[in-house]
Amino acid sequence: MAPQLNIGMVGLDTSHCLAFTRILNDRRDEYHISGAEVVAAYPGGSESFSHSRNRVQGFTQQMGDEYGVQIYDDIATLTRHVDAILLESVDGRQHLEQFEQLAIGKPVYIDKPLATTTADAYALVDIAAQTGTPIMSCSALRYAA
């Protein structure tokens, strides 16, 4: 049996964090993907964005209670416990700042939006190249069943 891929998640302010965790962690889910599990998360959140501010606490609670995900207080600690990262923050204005902390050579999936400005998108790609960090960004609907 291949070793499990331990995934960390940054940004627990979107329903996507629960959807991805369910298909990776819940073996009973009809779309379960074996071989990987979300094991660690950093809540993040954006006080200036109501879609984030109003949801981060509840989603963080669910991640820990329903899926046993270890919640960390900072990104650096999270990265030491995982093999790959899902950057899920709903407020795309935070993606560049968060990615700067995540760019340590481990693969990072950046949920939509990749960035909110062209300059930030180019900066993300430059940082990924400089640090040897593989990145991917897309809408999850592209892969929906």
What positions do the PLM features span?
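Conserved short-loop catalytic and cofactor-binding motifs
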Residues: 8, 112, 138
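Hydrophobic residues in well-ordered beta-strands that form the structural core
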Residues: 73, 110, 135-137
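Short helix/strand-capping hinge loops at secondary-structure junctions
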Residues: 107, 112-113
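A contiguous active-site-proximal alpha/beta segment in oxidoreductase catalytic domains
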Residues: 115-145
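Proline- and acidic/polar-enriched loop/turn elements at helix boundaries
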Residues: 76, 91, 113-114, 140
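N-terminal glycine-/serine-/threonine-rich beta1-alpha1-beta2 phosphate-ribose binding loop
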Residues: 1-104, 121-122, 130-131
